[in-house]
Amino acid sequence: MTSPESSSAAGSGDRAVAAAAERAKLTAGRNIPSFDDLPLPADTANLREGADLSDALLALLPLVGVWRGEGEGRGHDGDYRFGQQIVVSHDGGDYLNWEARSWRLNETGDYQERGLRETGFWRFVRDPDDPSESQAIELLLAHSAGYVELFYGRPRTQSSWELVTDALARSRSGVLVGGAKRLYGIVEGGDLAYVEERVDADGGLVPHLSARLSRFAG
């Protein structure tokens, strides 16, 4: 006999699947714009279009798409809310393109000012001499605040990934920041959620950013 709890859980799961199917009707036909006069494969954020995803990236397949939503941040001036768009695309190569743009929101949830912005690439480590590294991930990022960062990590599950800063370099005009730890995951309803902690002036990891983003394209 099915318990009320399991029936409720099953119903919740069914609703989540139905909601995801409805969203897919909208997102499946969307992609990022591209120029069609270049001689190489175009970037695509939709796995239904463009070049096939490299076999080397199959463990990152759920990330591909355009994601939009809101999150919470903690800065020198206190806590704040932000909107964000993340674009994860590929051109058939052995890397994913990554671009994240955010903007601060005011108390009514409207745009207030530009926020953090970063661009870079996800890659898998290839080391024939060390098979244990075959699932290691590199995330190379350039931040608009004036620093570049290399994250290193591994998949935790088929739909979650954990990374920590391995190296960080600041430009002469860049902000002072510490290393970070990030956890990304596909959560209920197919959303992309993440949390980031950064090292503060006392040398400890403290909450910095968190967000939950819904698929907009792909």
Curated annotation (Swiss-Prot):
Cofactors: heme b
CDD domains: lipocalin_heme-bd-THAP4-like
Keywords, sorted A to Z: Heme, Iron, Isomerase, Metal-binding
Chemical reaction(s) catalysed: peroxynitrite = nitrate
Single annotated GO MF: heme binding
Root EC class: isomerase
InterPro entries noted in UniProt: Calycin, Nb(III)_bact/plant, Nitrobindin, THAP4-like_heme-bd
SUPFAM superfamilies with a match to the protein in the record: Lipocalins
EC number: 5.99.-.-
Residues where heme b binds: K181, H208
Keyword Membrane: no
Pathway(s) it belongs to: Nitrogen metabolism
Oligomer and partners: Homodimer.
HAMAP family: nitrobindin
The family this protein is said to belong to: Belongs to the nitrobindin family.
Domain notes: Forms a 10-stranded antiparallel beta-barrel structure able to accommodate a hydrophobic ligand in its interior. In fact, this fold hosts the heme group, which is located in a wide surface cleft.
Name of this protein: Peroxynitrite isomerase 1
Annotated source species: Mycobacterium avium (strain 104)
